[in-house]
């Protein structure tokens, strides 16, 4: 255990803006009709990738009915293979913004390069993916604009490194940072990643920033997402980020870890029940 991490004086020295010591009350981030943090359960849902207007709108309609508070959709996809579908780019952003307006849901999409910022003008939340968690030039650029940033934990990032990345954004003047645990790389290969449930209470003790969990990337398999999602809420997470697709078998990206709308609806209902027990 790194006891230095839990020393308040050291925390204030290394993370003066992110440390809970500097901001004892948890941060609440308003995003359109939603609010992230505090007593608000956040349910982000939608396809891994925007594939077409028909696919996106069908999924958006379904997750809205199921209880989603924010619509997700990937448009610039940093894929492991250069031959994999990498998203629709600017056209995907246009469709995502249109779907957000149609179904009255704030939107979130991953940004991979600061040069793309003008294209994200109509997107409500900018996501920094695990691969870019330590892209400090990107973090600084995002800190100089006002949209909320959803900062995913890197594949092998420590708590300190994750906090430091948040500090990069905060230091540039943007106070709206949301942390998202999405699983880390470990020695086992039975799941896509290993969900670090301990990160939830630990990070909530260290920082005032909201902490969400992405059980889709942690599991890599749709059948395990509900269990991990329920566990995350029970551990104190402020919400979930879940991949949902109306036809996962035909998905162009990560279909194996996408829930059907009806399965997401059941997970959302379970999450609300658990949330109600923790926040009576």
Region spans (language model):
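Glycine-rich, proline-tolerant flexible connector loops at the mouths of alpha/beta enzymes
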Residues: 72-91, 246-256
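N-terminal amphipathic alpha-helix/helix-capping segment at the start of soluble metabolic enzymes
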Residues: 2, 6-44, 269-271, 277-280
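Alpha-helix-loop-beta-strand connector modules within alpha/beta enzyme cores
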Residues: 85-109, 141-148, 197-212, 257-279
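Hydrophobic faces of well-ordered beta-strands that scaffold small-molecule active sites
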Residues: 41-47, 69-73, 107-109, 126-128, ...
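Catalytic beta/alpha-barrel core
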Residues: 88, 103-115, 123-139, 147-159, ...
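Catalytic alpha/beta core domains of metabolic enzymes, predominantly
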Residues: 36, 145-244
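Active-site mouth loops of central-metabolism enzymes
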Residues: 41-58, 82-86, 106-110, 129-130, ...
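N-terminal small/glycine-rich loop or linker at the start of catalytic domains
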Residues: 26-48, 77-79, 204-213
């Amino acid at each position: 255990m790194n006891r230095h991490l839990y020393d308040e004086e050291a925390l204030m020295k290394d993370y003066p803006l992110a440390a809970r010591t500097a901001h004892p009350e948890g941060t609440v981030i308003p995003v359109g009709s939603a609010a992230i943090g505090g007593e608000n359960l956040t349910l982000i849902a939608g396809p891994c990738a925007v594939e077409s207007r028909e696919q996106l709108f069908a999924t958006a309609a379904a997750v809205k009915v199921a209880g989603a508070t924010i619509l997700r959709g990937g448009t610039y996809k940093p894929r492991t293979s250069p031959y994999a579908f990498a998203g629709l780019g600017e056209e995907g952003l246009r469709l995502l913004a249109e779907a957000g307006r149609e179904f009255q849901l704030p939107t979130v999409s991953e940004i991979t390069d600061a040069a793309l910022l003008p294209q994200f003008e109509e997107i409500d939340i900018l996501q920094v993916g695990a691969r870019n968690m330590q892209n400090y030039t990107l973090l600084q650029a995002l800190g100089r604009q006002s949209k909320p940033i959803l900062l995913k934990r890197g594949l092998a990032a420590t708590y300190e490194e994750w906090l430091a990345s948040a500090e990069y954004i905060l230091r540039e003047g943007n106070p709206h940072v949301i942390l998202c645990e999405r699983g880390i790389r470990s020695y086992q290969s039975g799941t896509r990643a290993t969900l670090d449930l301990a990160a939830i209470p630990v990070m909530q003790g260290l920082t005032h920033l909201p902490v969400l969990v992405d059980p889709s990337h942690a599991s890599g398999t749709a059948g395990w997402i509900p269990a991990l999602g329920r566990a995350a809420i029970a551990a104190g997470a402020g919400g979930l980020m879940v991949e949902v697709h109306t036809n996962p078998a035909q998905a162009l990206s990560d279909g194996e870890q996408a829930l059907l709308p009806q399965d997401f609806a059941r997970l959302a209902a379970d999450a609300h029940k658990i949330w109600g027990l923790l926040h009576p």
